[in-house]
Amino acid sequence: MKVKFKNSDLFKGNYKKFKLAALDIDGTLINSHHIITSRTKNAIKKAKDAGIKVTISTGRHYRSALSRAKEINIDAPLICSDGALIKDFSTNSAIYHSLSKEIAADIMKTASQYDDFKIQIFTEERKINIGSSYRSKYFKRFLREPLKHSPIGYFNLMRDFAFIPVTNVKNVDEAIKAMEEEPLKVVVYGNERQEDLKLFIEEITKKYKDEISITSAIDNCIDILRGGVSKAKGLAVVSEKLGLNREEIIAVGDNINDIKMIEYAGLGVAMGNAPERVKSKADYVTADNDSEGLAIFFEKLLAGEIQIKETLPQTKFCQSER
């Protein structure tokens, strides 16, 4: 059972109870320029020096997550693809929570019947795109958005994508042939009629019920995983491997796919840029990712200044580092 703390509770001098911190990447670890600031890196290092192991828990593909994991020198197993893959670098081993090829194939066929949906399949080593990478009008807009607000951010996002080997195929049948192993997840970008994605979700949920899990980290886009798989599931696997209980874990995130992880951890932290649905599940709300909220959280934690259900004031984007 998750421990909930009263508003008056402080962690003064008690940060040592926490042995692991699991960090989301997008909207949490990185800012809108897709940069991990020096302040954030320093705060993470100090947390590690204080005895808190640090890992990443992300919806990203393993290859994209790996570069960020190396950047902050994680010292616990890496959780990626929303908990569908856990990589332990200390033992060079992996744990998979894969979809069956049959279910993935049927989901892809169903999605392909909707106009202008973009479909991707994540396996451990690659990403498979059905149709042109830029076929979906919505997906084009999704890629253009970072360019509009931050050319540097767009460049860094594309650099992260470049780490992932990509196979482009024409249709679902070719995608099935291209899958050398069972898929970790199917990603579906909806079209400009958001009700179509809702209908698609209803259709596959009715058919597969508990055999699949559906989550989201991007507007009008869903990740379809094996039933029961989530970042929380991945975090439970990691905590068991490390011999930790839930009360010894910190989880920090900003989006819908972080909710279960935030609820699972002894100390669940929401970023200031998170929607209210996420903040309401957190024990603590820090500043937003463009105000170095993750760094601020660790600094306050180590200083014994964390008060549960405290919400830090949000500020405009920190221009000090790009």
Task: Label every PLM stretch briefly.
Residues 32-36:
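Conserved ATPase-coupling elements of RecA-like P-loop NTPase cores
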Residues 72-74, 82, 208, 264-265, ...:
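Short, structured coil segments at secondary-structure junctions
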Residues 47, 58, 82, 186, ...:
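Residue-level signal for inorganic ion chemistry
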Residues 38-152:
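Active-site phosphate-binding/coordination module
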Residues 27, 60, 83, 253-255:
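Active-site metal-binding loops of divalent metal-dependent hydrolases
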Residues 2-4, 11-20, 24, 37, ...:
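Mg2+-dependent phosphoryl-transfer enzymes with acidic/Ser/Thr/Gly-rich catalytic loops
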